[in-house]
Amino acid sequence: MMQDLRLILIIVGAIAIIALLVHGFWTSRKERSSMFRDRPLKRMKSRDDESENDDFDDNVEGVGEVRVHPVTHAPHGAHGEHEAPRQSPQHQYQPPYERQMQQPARPEEPVRQPPQPPRQAPVPPQQQPAPHAAPQPGWQQPQPAQPPVQPQHQPQPVVQQPVAPQPVTPTVAQPQPAAPQQPAPQPVAASQPAVAEPQPVEPQQPAAPQPKERKETVIVMNVAAHHGAQLNGEVLINSIQQAGFKFGEMNIFHRHLSPDGSGPVLFSLANMVKPGTFNPDSMADMMTPGVTIFMQVPSYGDELQNFKLMLQSAQYIADEVGGVVLDDQRRMMTPQKLREYQDRIREVKDANA
C-alpha cells in the first residue's frame, strides 16, 4: 500500500509541475504578444507626427516660393529670349494646391518632360555627322537628300575591300596538297587484313572440356561365401528376387526405383564369375563363389539414399545365403570403408553441382 501511495504522489507531483510550467509559458507569451501590439500604435503615432511636420514644412516652402516668383517676372520683360527657358518655375506655383492635396505634386514630374523638343533642335547639325546619324534613319525623313553626299565618301573604303579577297586565293591552293594525302588511307586498309589474321585466335571456346570435368565413380561391394565354400544358386535367386532385383539387360539383375521393375535403375547385381551373367533357367543348379553389386554415381535421385538401399540389399542377401559382405577389394566391409564410399559420393555430387 505504501508503494502504491508513493507512486500516486509522484505522478500527481509530476502533473502539477508540468501544469505550472505550461501556465508560466502561456503567461509569458501573452505578455509578449501584448507588448508587440503596443509597439505598432507608437509607430503609427510617430508617423502621424512626422507627416504633420512635413506638411507644415511644405506649406512654409510654398509661401517662400510665391515671394520669389514676382522677382523673376521683372527680368523676364527685360531680357526677352535669353530667359525664356526659365519659365519652368512658373509650374512651381502649384505648391499652394499641395496644402489641400499632396498627390498633384507627383504629376508635376511629367510636366518637366518637355526637354524632348530641344532634341529636335540639333537636327541641322546632323548633316555634318551624317555617318553617326546613319543608325537612326527611321526618325529622320529628310535624309534622302543626303545619300548623294554619302556615296562620295563611301567609294574610298570600297577600294580597300577588293584587297581582302587576295589572301583568299592562296587558301584555294592549300586543298591541292591535301588531295595527294587522301590516297594515303588506302594502304592503311591493306594493312588491316594483316591485323585481322590474329582474330581467328580469339575463338577459343573451352566449352568442350566442361562436360569432361563431370566426375563419375562406381561404388562396388560383394556378397561372397565363406573361405572354401560356394553359394547355392536356388537360395541365391530367391534372395535376389526378394531384395527387389529384376532380371533385365545384359543378362544381369537390376534394382529399379520401384520394386515392380519400373522406373530408372538405381544399382545392379552381376555374377562374380566371368562373364558375370546369369541364366535364370539353369540358375537353380548353379553354384558360385559370390555376386557383385555395383552403383554408378551420379545416378537418379539422391545417391546417398541409393547407397544405403544398396548396402541393405547386400546385407539381406548375405544373411539369406550364409555369406559375408566384402568391399571392392574383396575385404571385410568396415565402417571406415563405408565412410570412404560416402565421401566419394559427396565429392562427385559437389563437382557436378
UniProtKB/Swiss-Prot annotation:
Keyword presence, Transmembrane helix: yes
Gene3D superfamilies: ZipA, C-terminal FtsZ-binding domain (3.30.1400.10)
Segments of skewed composition (Low complexity): 151-163, 187-199
Presence of the UniProt keyword Membrane in the record: yes
Quaternary structure, from the entry: Interacts with FtsZ via their C-terminal domains.
Family under the similarity heading: Belongs to the ZipA family.
Official protein name in the record: Cell division protein ZipA
Lineage: Bacteria, Pseudomonadati, Pseudomonadota, Gammaproteobacteria, Enterobacterales
